[in-house]
């Protein structure tokens, strides 16, 4: 499987993580956090924040040339306004991916945690720890970057399961079904 760009969306900061998934092997490529400049946060200039997200992800896609894009779905917000801003930030990220002809996959936070930690109720530290373990990292990435790497790992595992299921044969009472 090719390079996968995972994204943990946010309207103030957004984590990204890139992994190489070959068969069942996962390899770390890069990760980081796109931070919105303080003046844009103070001015509460959402349109400019969305531009920063779009431009930053476009540059990351251009630099690393991933073949697949996975992003976490919005699962909760402090208020309706926060949910709308987060949804718009996700939209900017998705448009950056689609603009570069990347297929987009979306995953619920619980599914990401389940895929990486083994339980959908995992906390951030458990996710960070398992990301380090699965990718053989000596140092834990920032929380948002670890979450983005977890999204990429979830996508890689989901794709591997689909490949396995497509090639699998079921046996019942000694005969192929």
UniProtKB/Swiss-Prot annotation:
GO terms for biological process: DNA recombination; DNA repair. Mg(2+) 1 binds at residues 8, 144. It comes from Teredinibacter turnerae (strain ATCC 39867 / T7901). It catalyses: Endonucleolytic cleavage at a junction such as a reciprocal single-stranded crossover between two homologous DNA duplexes (Holliday junction). GO terms for cellular component: cytoplasm; Holliday junction resolvase complex. Homodimer which binds Holliday junction (HJ) DNA. The HJ becomes 2-fold symmetrical on binding to RuvC with unstacked arms; it has a different conformation from HJ DNA in complex with RuvA. In the full resolvosome a probable DNA-RuvA(4)-RuvB(12)-RuvC(2) complex forms which resolves the HJ. Mg(2+) 2 binds at residue 72. The active site is at 8, 72, 144. It is found in: Cytoplasm. CDD domains: RuvC (cd16962). Its cofactor is Mg(2+). The keyword Hydrolase applies. Its EC number is 3.1.21.10. Belongs to the RuvC family. GO terms for molecular function: crossover junction DNA endonuclease activity; DNA binding; magnesium ion binding. Keywords: Cytoplasm, DNA damage, DNA recombination, DNA repair, DNA-binding, Endonuclease, Hydrolase, Magnesium, Metal-binding, Nuclease. This is Crossover junction endodeoxyribonuclease RuvC. Gene3D superfamilies: Ribonuclease H-like superfamily/Ribonuclease H. The keyword Magnesium applies. Its main location: cytoplasm. Binds 2 Mg(2+) ion per subunit. InterPro entries: RNaseH-like_sf, RNaseH_sf, X-over_junc_endoDNase_Mg_BS, X-over_junc_endoDNase_RuvC. It holds the Pfam family RuvC. PANTHER family: CROSSOVER JUNCTION ENDODEOXYRIBONUCLEASE RUVC.
């Amino acid at each position: 499987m090719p390079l996968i760009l995972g994204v943990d969306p946010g309207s103030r900061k957004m984590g990204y993580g890139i992994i190489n998934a070959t068969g069942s092997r996962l390899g770390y490529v890069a990760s980081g956090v796109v931070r919105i400049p303080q003046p844009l946060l103070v001015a509460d200039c959402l349109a400019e924040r969305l531009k920063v997200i779009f431009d930053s992800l476009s540059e990351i896609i251009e630099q690393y040339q991933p073949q697949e894009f996975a992003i976490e779905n919005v699962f909760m917000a402090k208020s309706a306004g926060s949910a709308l801003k987060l949804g718009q930030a996700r939209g900017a990220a998705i448009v950056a991916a689609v603009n570069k002809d990347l297929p987009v996959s979306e995953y619920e936070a619980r599914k990401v945690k389940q895929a990486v930690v083994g339980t959908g109720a995992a906390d951030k530290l458990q996710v960070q720890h398992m990301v380090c373990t699965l990718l053989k990292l000596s140092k834990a990435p920032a929380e948002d970057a670890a979450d983005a790497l977890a999204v990429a790992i979830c996508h890689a595992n989901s794709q591997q399961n689909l490949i396995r299921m497509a090639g699998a044969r079921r046996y019942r009472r000694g005969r192929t079904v």
